[in-house]
Amino acid sequence: GSEMCIRDSVPLVCFTGQVPLPLIGNDAFQEVDIVGITRNITKYSVTVRDRKDLGKIIKMAFHIARTGKPGPVLIDLPKDIQTASGPAEYPDKVEIRGYRVNDTVHVGQLKRAYKMLKSAKKPLILAGGGINVARANENLRRFVEAENVPVVTTIMGKGAIPTTHPLYVGNCGMHGKYAANKAVSECDLLFSIGTRFNDRITGDLNEFAPKAKIVHIDVDTASISRNVVVDVPIVADANVALDKLNEWAEPKKTAEWQKQIKAWDEENPLGMRRDKGMTPQMIMEHINKNYKDAIYVTDVGQHQMWATQYLELDSNSQLLTSGGLGTMGFGLPAAIGAKIANPDKDVVLSLIHISEP
């Protein structure tokens, strides 16, 4: 769960039990160095060693989990800390040494990226899950419409812009649309926001976007040029960057480029056979017609790919899925959580088969 959350930028605070403080380090019965084990799959992990620090640590944990690139935090509670009594102190705010949330953008780098966008003949915006995490969807839509630039998404980025929007091409990558992948291959500028460029999107790195200059905007410094070496790296929250870009935005002439992308889509569209009885694609079509404004949740498997290919999303709907790790078993608990958090919304869950519940 923790590894999935760190890949998909899901805020999570885990509380684990530990042997009493005096026994730590003695190989006591059921002692596990859970902090050490999870250090590489959490943003922060800590053992509470003084009950008086508990409130401060919990405050820190939720702040770290939610800010920057969201992710998991682990708090390890020794048994004697759990059973200790005394007044609880929960501070209004905490200062965390060495932890800084970047709420700015390097305007010079952003201007450089924008100039490249203006001069490009075949520009393409690649929107990743970072758009949905930052809730920058409206900002992205405004920028896309102002610039008149086509958009492709990753699986985790689906819904970053309404799927029925005329400038939306589709998902790219291993399970993406032909037109979206062709556009990535032929574009001369790939303007990427909130994506890690993982292998399911890029395939062979030597063949990925071979004709394009690449701009990469991401809140996580470690993601920049990790998989794909980019021409203009920009460390910034998606909303912060898009706010500034929207101040500069003005329409581009991309009619011929859009016409070419449409031709590719007509050449190899997503199919839907209707001569063999009920198909999974027809089920997705039925969901689109009857469950608008819903939260769609999938488990992991081929049914997940059908959902990412055929579900229609707009500003009032959402897709929850395990993209970075492909965690089977994710669907049911995620759907339960989605319903608890949104009791007035329909939640549609797609499972591998009906035996999971």
List each model region and its residues.
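Generic structural signal of hydrophobic/aromatic residues within well-ordered alpha-helices
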Residues: 38, 245, 257-264, 307
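N-terminal alpha/beta PP-like core and its mobile active-site loop of ThDP/TPP-dependent enzymes
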Residues: 1-249, 286, 295, 346
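Active-site diphosphate/adenylate-binding microenvironment
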Residues: 262-344
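Short beta-strand-to-loop acidic/aromatic patch adjacent to the donor-nucleotide binding site
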Residues: 349
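Long, charged amphipathic helices and adjacent flexible linkers at domain junctions
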Residues: 90-107, 254-277
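A short, hydrophobic C-terminal helix/tail in secreted or cell-surface proteins
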Residues: 354-357
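Short coil/turn segments at secondary-structure boundaries
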Residues: 74-76, 128, 256-260, 299-300
